[in-house]
Amino acid sequence: MGSVASCLEGVLDMIQGRLGNALARLQAAFPAQASGSAEKILAGRPSLEITLSIALYETDALDEVEQLLGEVLPHAKESSPPDSLISAHVLLARVALLKGDRDAWLRLLADLEQIGQQAGSARVICSAWLERARAATLENRLESARQALRYAELHADWERPGILLHGNDVDTPSITRFRLHIAQGDCQDTERDLRQAMAEANARQHHRRELKLRLLHALALNALERSEEAFEALSEALRFASHEGFMRTFLDEGPRLGSLLQRWAVLHQAQSRALGIEPRFLTTLLQRFVGHGEAPTPGQAPGAVGEGLTTREIQVIRLLAAGHRNKVIAEKMFLSEFTVKSHLRNINAKLGAQGRTEAVAIARARGLLD
């Protein structure tokens, strides 16, 4: 029964936004379940591993998640409750899509939908369609997203105020609808509804959900050209997430949030510690947005692929960040001043910067100066 208790406590930790506690609790319980095949299946191990996978996924430990869920999914199909089945299939599908395996993504969601149909579970069926709608929205396939959301809403009577089902903590019909409305530019009412949803989540201590809603709220404010309010919302989200390690909550919102985060970083990254934001978390998050292809270079439209800086251009921007003028940079790199100026023009064009100071700020936000 120890693994069942650890699993339930880990679920509560996740709902309340205590990712660090959840990881520590679940990882401590996991080795105790590593022996005894009967206990693995009968004493809650599939649910324990799936709950641990949710926590690991939030830290962007995708390989560990893939390994854990790949091992446990056959047992989960036989013995796990709907929340575990939903989480296992959706997380594995997302990891597959992130790694470029769209066929596996399609297959896992089809499997989940079939399980829901066989079990007569509207929520399981709905969850498969919610994930399809989420992916289509992020890929800017908005008509496909609308259609997937319509199918999800046919099975959405389980979403009620005050009821939280942990397999759908941050993936509900309303959250999916908010995301789609923002992508469509329908943000006036959405911004108001997000404020109300955040207040309700906060009152119930559903802080993981509140974090997701806050990021969507920042995107809605940004779309309404209320940039300062959007940056304030993002600062608050980063302040909370950086001390718990919530990484994928940000990354899963794709290029639109990545672009907003990089604009925020140009203005505020240097003051991150004073804002109560853990600098190492912020640097890692910015790098992973770029590394996963989930953030455009500043100055480009979301979804565009930026041209990377060459090794020589990175040397130039680092010397510039160190405070050196063109003449000194030329001497240190054995170049002419004309060549240095040419490199700086290329750097500004690639980073979407208007001048030297902004180029350095953007390079720092992208982790190029580390």
Model-inferred region functions:
Residues 261, 266-307, 311-312:
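Intrinsically disordered or compositionally simple regulatory linkers and C-terminal tails
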Residues 296-350, 354, 360-370:
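Helix-turn-helix DNA-binding segment
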Residues 114-119, 123-138, 201-204, 209-244:
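Repeat-solenoid scaffold signature
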Residues 173, 189-216, 296-302:
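Generic long, charged, amphipathic alpha-helical segments
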Residues 2-18, 43-61, 84-100, 124-141, ...:
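Tandem amphipathic alpha-helical repeat scaffolds
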Residues 150-154, 231-246, 255-258, 262, ...:
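TPR/TPR-like (Sel1-like) alpha-helical repeat modules
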Residues 24-38, 70-81, 109-121, 150-163, ...:
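Amphipathic alpha-helical segments of tetratricopeptide repeats
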